[in-house]
Amino acid sequence: MTEYKLVVVGAGGVGKSALTIQLIQNHFVDEYDPTIEDSYRKQVVIDGETCLLDILDTAGQEEYSAMRDQYMRTGEGFLCVFAINNTKSFEDIHHYREQIKRVKDSEDVPMVLVGNKCDLPSRSVDTKQAQDLARSYGIPFIETSAKTRQRVEDAFYTLVREIRQYRLRKLSKEEETTQCIKL
């Protein structure tokens, strides 16, 4: 069974835990209890492949930022979450992305931009703004609602597909560099 190490990042209060718990346990957590760090595992079938998702739900609070480097090193793919009713959380995405690229020492890191809380009647981040940002990064963008479960699986499964493509790219690069000619 293939294992995927997913990390959920974003500012405090954007719904990282709510998204993760909705995926894992199929229910919405209404109360806000800031996370320090929680780990979840779930077996799912994505595109016919049985996968083990190892999901790290991280702290959005700035006082835990020192822990970020460690989980960014071990994560294979990142859900970069902002809340559509919180402009600052959207602006923070850039900092998370830059930190991930720095820690991974790579421009090519599997990521999905997630605009959460799309069930809310008012928004401060326009869908087009988020689509444009995702396009500039070359990553998918998905709007979710942890409350209604809208596109929650889609966000995590899309990240798994991004990791698969990344692994294939890495594999073909390794094959290119290790080819030898027998005389």
Swiss-Prot record:
Keywords: Cell membrane, GTP-binding, Hydrolase, Lipoprotein, Membrane, Nucleotide-binding, Prenylation. It catalyses: GTP + H2O = GDP + phosphate + H(+). Signal peptide: none annotated. GO terms for biological process: signal transduction. GO terms for molecular function: G protein activity; GTP binding. InterPro entries: P-loop_NTPase, Small_GTP-bd, Small_GTPase, Small_GTPase_Ras-type. A motif (Effector region) lies at residues 32-40. SMART domains: RAB, RAS, RHO. GTP binds at residues 10-17, 57-61, 116-119. Ras proteins bind GDP/GTP and possess intrinsic GTPase activity. Belongs to the small GTPase superfamily. Ras family. NCBIfam families: small_GTP (TIGR00231). This is Ras-like protein.
